[in-house]
Amino acid sequence: MKHKIITFGELMLRLSPDNNERFTQAHSYEAVYGGGEANTAVSLANFNVDTRYVTKLPKHTIGQSAVNSLRQYGVDISRIVRGGDQIGIYFLEKKTSQRPTNVIYNRNGSAFALATKGDFDWDSIFDGATWFHFSGITPAISDNMAEITIEACKEAKKRGITVSCDLNYRSKLWSSEKANKVMSEVCRYVDICIANEDDAVGIFGMDASKSDKEKNAYIAEELTKMFPNFKMVASVWRTETSITTFKLQSMIYTEGKAYYSQEFFMNILDYIGAGDAYCAGIIYSLINDFDPQKAVEFSNAASCLKHTVSGDFNLVSVDEVMKLAFAKAGNEVSR
């Protein structure tokens, strides 16, 4: 079966001070484009999966530059709506040693935030589609976008399209109360859910400490009780092992059983987009009929490799992911 993946969300301009400076020091900024669903689309395109990205961007040259950032990797940009005045921007102060990452959003009033239902022709967008992916960031952007996301889910389900959602709770975008109200409706249409402990706590108020079970398995089990339509819950988490090193592991929960990946110990160049790379790994695994253990290993390796790539996009191939996931290699020189 030939698959076509649709991802839907906001493509933003990311500005980061050079040389790990603070905002108060910065005189120059590195500019790249990214956004959860766009990052997933680029990953899938690099895996040679037919992928269409849907958003709304201004017609000016910055908007066109954002479109070009996707086109160069083979993402189908034919359904991107053009209009509005502003592109969403986020300022990123990168984590350095004990200093945490700091993000400031400037996206209120962006073309995507102000989009209306009439901007998106779902018959055209879903033409030939087999999978629809979005994140919880999209409905958090504005009330309009919450309504549009629900409409998109309904349209996808009407067409028998598989729906996946990365819950991706962002406290800077909406309150727990509002997230709970909207995502409780959205999740009724979701088949594959990607969620971690922060998402479960922030949106649904779960407390894994009350259970003797491993917390990610507990959260996945509780989510499937809340939403019996979930065929799978997947989770990836990063644990700090020292100031400079981290441990990465992930889990897939399906049919009442949890499957865990191997652990990767790593240094981080850029972790933005690592969760989106994981989503791409899950989607790629499922459309290629990987069993749960193979799927969790592949997806975890895809996320691990993203930590080695600067910018939002995970510029790696299926072969590279497979090699890390299953050949247990990566220290030797590739000749």
Predicted regions and their residues:
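Conserved N-terminal subdomain of the carbohydrate kinase-like
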Residues: 50-137, 321-335
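Conserved post-catalytic alpha-helical subdomain immediately downstream of the catalytic base
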Residues: 262-328
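Short pre-catalytic strand/loop immediately N-terminal to key active-site residues, enriched for Gly-Thr
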Residues: 24-34, 221, 259-273
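Alpha-helix C-terminal capping segments
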Residues: 32, 40-50, 285-288
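A short helix->loop->beta-strand "cap" motif at the edges of active sites that frequently abuts
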Residues: 155-162, 227-231
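Histidine-anchored nucleotide/phosphate-binding helix
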Residues: 36-46, 149-155
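Conserved phosphate/ATP/ADP-binding segment of small-molecule kinases
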Residues: 173-255
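Positively charged, low-complexity intrinsically disordered leader regions
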Residues: 1-22
